[in-house]
Amino acid sequence: YTPDDWYRLIQDKYQQIRKTQADSTQNLGERVNDIAFWKECLFHREKAIAQLASDRTRRPNIELCRLVNEVYEVDETIQTLQQRLRDSEDTLQSLAHTKANTLYIDQEK
């Protein structure tokens, strides 16, 4: 290899590393936003359930049997949202670990 070839190789690697870092940073930001979104969804769902239960129990002579089905449906939704939240947090943790490794490798070079 000539010095120019080495220089081009180093520049290419440098650009690849910068692109990977930018992608990692973007992915981290997206996962943080996902986590905030899923937490907000869970909060609003739980608040809605509490309000439904409160409204139903205060109305006299109205059967509460539909409430049981609604609670099961909402519970399934909450479990799904919690799973999505866990998935997003796991992805964020993985991306943060990858980013830390990338920065460590860059510092050694």
UniProtKB/Swiss-Prot annotation:
Pfam families registered for this protein in UniProt: Tektin (PF03148)
Gene Ontology biological-process entries: cilium assembly; flagellated sperm motility
UniProt-annotated location(s): Cytoplasm, Cytoskeleton, Cilium axoneme; Cytoplasm, Cytoskeleton, Flagellum axoneme; Cytoplasmic vesicle, Secretory vesicle, Acrosome outer membrane
Alphabetically ordered keywords of this record: Cell projection, Cilium, Cytoplasm, Cytoplasmic vesicle, Cytoskeleton, Flagellum, Membrane, Ubl conjugation
Quaternary organization: Microtubule inner protein component of sperm flagellar doublet microtubules. Interacts with TEKT1, TEKT2, TEKT4 and TEKT5. Interacts with CCDC38.
Family that this chain belongs to: Belongs to the tektin family.
Function: Microtubule inner protein (MIP) part of the dynein-decorated doublet microtubules (DMTs) in cilia and flagellar axoneme. Forms filamentous polymers in the walls of ciliary and flagellar microtubules. Required for normal sperm mobility.
Protein name: Tektin-3
Organism classification: Eukaryota, Metazoa, Chordata, Craniata, Vertebrata
